């Protein structure tokens, strides 16, 4: 992957973050993962020109711009961990409640292995306030993880489990009767995803 250190602000008059990222995207002709480094260390750093936490949140949004679709910009890196670990300037709170509120899996790296694993099969039993999903691997390339998604009322939730775990219990705050769909995918070592294994009530 490419990780250029783009530590300038979005409003920089000479080298704005978005412009630099666009240039790097143009150079990325092989469409490898391009994850710009963002200067989290500058948030409330006591200097004469600190960043507000919103600068980093807005840079994350810039990496998700539709104009960058298909260019290899599939995420970003925060440098360094101190500001995140200590929630300096409210950075961790802002990111966790906003641009990073929803868990995500890493993007696949198909140039290392383009073949997805076979889809698993699933069986679901209900009891109390939880559903138990039994997962049986498909024949062929072994999975390293399971991506399990379920809809509880109007909210989609997801978790990643190791492939050695063949049974998972899903909680349903709105009640098990509110869960109207479960989707399981096998993930391989480079995060290729299998076809969906889908469960619906009555299936």
Predicted regions and their residues:
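Solvent-exposed loop/turn segments flanking beta-strands in beta-repeat/beta-sandwich domains
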Residues: 138-153, 158, 179
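Extracellular fibronectin type III
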Residues: 189-203
């Amino acid at each position: 992957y490419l990780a250029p250190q783009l530590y300038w602000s979005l409003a920089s008059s000479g080298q704005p973050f978005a412009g630099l990222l666009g240039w790097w995207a143009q150079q990325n002709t092989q469409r490898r993962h391009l994850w710009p480094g963002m200067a989290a260390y500058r948030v409330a750093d006591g200097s004469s020109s600190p960043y507000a936490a919103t600068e980093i949140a807005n840079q994350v949004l810039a990496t998700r711009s539709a104009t960058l679709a298909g260019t290899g910009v599939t995420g970003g890196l925060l440098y360094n961990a101190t500001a995140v670990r200590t929630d300096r300037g409210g950075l961790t709170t802002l990111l966790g409640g906003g641009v990073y509120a929803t868990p995500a899996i890493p993007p696949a790296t198909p140039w290392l292995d383009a073949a997805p694993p076979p889809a698993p099969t699933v069986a679901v039993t209900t009891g109390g306030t939880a559903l138990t999903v039994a997962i049986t691997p498909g024949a062929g390339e072994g999975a390293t993880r399971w991506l399990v998604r379920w809809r509880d009322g109007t909210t989609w939730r997801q978790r990643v489990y190791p492939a050695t775990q063949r049974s998972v219990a899903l909680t349903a705050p709105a009640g098990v009767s509110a869960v109207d769909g479960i989707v399981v995918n096998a993930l391989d070592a480079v995060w290729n995803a299998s076809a969906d294994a889908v469960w619906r009530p009555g299936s």
